[in-house]
Amino acid sequence: MLMTTTTIAMSLSHDVIIAAAQRAARAIPPLWPLASSVAVNPFLGQASEPLEVAAARLRRASGIAVTMPRSWYAERLQSGEITEDDLQAAFQTAPAARRPPNVSALKHAIKVARPAPQAIPTVAELARDVTAIDWPGIVNERIGHWAAGYFDQGQALWAVGQSGGAYSTWRIIATHDLTPEIAGLAGFSQSVSDAPATAEDALVDCVARLGLSPDALDGYFHRLLTTLGGWGQVARYRLWQAELNGGTDACVTDLLAIRMLWEAALLHNGGSALVPGWQSAIAAYAAPVAASSDDVVDSILQEAAERAAQRKLNTVLAAPSSARLSRGRLTLQMAFCIDVRSEVFRRALESLDSGITTLGFAGFFGFGIGHRRFASDVVEARLPVLLSPGVVTCAGEPTPAANAAELSARITARAKRAWGRFKLAAISSFAFVEATGPIYIAKLLRDGLALARHHAPTDPAPRPAHELDLDTRLTMAARILKAMSFTSNFARLVVLAGHGAKVVNNPHASALHCGACGGYSGEVNAQLLASLLNDHQVRAGLAERGIVIPADTLFLAALHDTTTDAVTLFADDHPSPTHAQDLAQVTQWLAAAGALARGERALRLPRANRSQDIAHRARDWAEIRPEWALAGCQAFIAAPRSRSAGRDLAGRAFLHDYDWRCDHGFGVLELILTAPVVVASWISLQYYGSTVAPERFGAGNKLLHNVTGGIGVVEGNGGILRTGLPWQSVHDGERLIHEPLRLSVLIEAPTEAIGAILERHPQLRALFDNRWLHLFALDDEGRMARRYIGDLSWETYVGDASSQSNRASTLA
């Protein structure tokens, strides 16, 4: 028997339903394709809520917990890593009405395992319980089978057409797919054929058929989108990209309509057996989202763990520095990406000579470019995903020789593509191995035994595709140098180091590249900036603006391989015989620093007993942990380098050079808070989500991965597209390598200036007010002096939670 459609459901307007669908679309994060994958905050849609409320919402929508098991916190409390004072301080931050009555009750709650999280059921799950048929699995498998073809980015030889949109394309296939009927869903293909022609009309129709109330829409739509896993997030990515370019995209709504057609068909097929359970589910979806007492306890424990880490960080920053200060002109200044992996190398390099100092800046070096590589028509967005490219660049000068080389490279590439398609074609693939297998023996042995060598990028030096006038070049150079707090005291040699990772047999390789460069390596941006700052006309104009670069200062680009800590200098871009001796010395320093950094990294990597083992891991097909990437990230520090130089931050901190005394109007501070800090928060929260909820926010087991459509990976034979980080990226097989802590942001600047920026940017402020990020102001000695407590208020940070009586809140 069919469920009787309620009067409320019938009265729901088209606009109300579509608005709820659009809100649900923004409750899930986007997923970038593998070729340019970047870290994404899985809690992007919950940034306006505190952790305990987000926990309640995601438990209903996904059946997950968003903090670690309580035993994890109990172990740290017992070992003394979390102190009683940390627990007390965290307890005080929780809303008084919802927290335990006292700290003793909180400590008792730690010993009790929290209830297993349960999502509100869908119709598919209710039907599974009644019929003993795995309808959720069948739905996921059929949608995944179609989506892999629809969203394919060149992997499939026979691509599914996309004309008409996702909903229309799916209907064409679903009306001829008898799998649901074979499984027991009678009449499904006919119901799809009879469904409304547009996704929006289908949503309205299904809402009525399912008897949904207005209050249930948001929660139910969110729930259905989470059941789609990465496929919903791929659609969300399309919406993100469209809105970035001033447009829109209906793909998320299309997928939601597809999923709801399955629900409506299952409810119709299930009859009266599903009605009681479904009515209860609708009531649960309609109930307001509210944090439980267990959610509050878990959020307090998470806060206590983060306060313990902040206390340790303050101790490191307050300790005397071992850095040696140069009394004369520096020999080498080397700018790195703020990436936490750079901290290890920077510390190693600076330890070699007092004439060396390093700087930290976002790895795209202020160049928001769309770059076309040599012999390619693909424009790569090499900038933070929050931004749109402002300049289009290409590789090589338009000379006859370069044009001939490009034509030859294109012919070679087309031949390789044709050969690759021949290997995979439906007929030729059967005879391919027998006919040509022997000629691959040498390559198989070389690659299988990790004997192949990585090579530095060989593209010609990049340049703007259309020449930029002097005023534009001058404005760009001045803006970038000021943003780097790098306007004086230039060394003879300044190296701008982008970073990338050279690994093999790794679908997530782009995730190891530079996040600020959109998932690409950073050498192109560094080369462009070096060329700009070596321009004599630009230097003359900068001098008129008060930025004097000595005539003997040479800027060079470099590429830091974060997997092996090898550094490639692009000295041929700007030949300078007068700097030959400097380059020889710098080359030696970089080699020595690389050896030191590899030795430190080897201590954390499994089966890396010596620093020499690191290079082999990068070439090993079977290596599932070539590097730890950004695992362990805990802090973001924007301050002069002197505040962190000579202090061992263990590769856990993003380091951004910033001097507020030179930042008139605090425009640079605003840029740091709204761009690099947000990107760092996405990275931190991706690692956090992949650790606390790997079943939902993690990519699963690398050993089971199959690349699908060039978009992402599935585990095994198909189904749900996995998102986030593989388990091997946060766990070494015995213990967690990433400690799931929300990022602590430390800024050396007046609290009034920071507060004014937060007030102008509500979305940024929400991250701090709801404690997705912690915020501290450093004093003039680089010590943590003030803690942001929300609502534009600050308290004195004393470094020891026991001194709560010294708390003094002020309004910034």
Curated annotation (Swiss-Prot):
Needed co-factor(s): Zn(2+)
GO molecular function: zinc ion binding
Database matches in InterPro entries: DabA
UniProt KW keywords: Cell inner membrane, Cell membrane, Membrane, Metal-binding, Transport, Zinc
Keyword S-adenosyl-L-methionine: no
Lipid bilayer topology: Peripheral membrane protein
Keyword Protease part of the UniProt annotation: no
Residues binding Zn(2+), per UniProt: 337, 339, 499, 514
Pfam families: DabA (PF10070)
UniProt function note: Part of an energy-coupled inorganic carbon pump.
Family affiliation: Belongs to the inorganic carbon transporter (TC 9.A.2) DabA family.
Self-association and partners: Forms a complex with DabB.
Record-given protein name: Probable inorganic carbon transporter subunit DabA
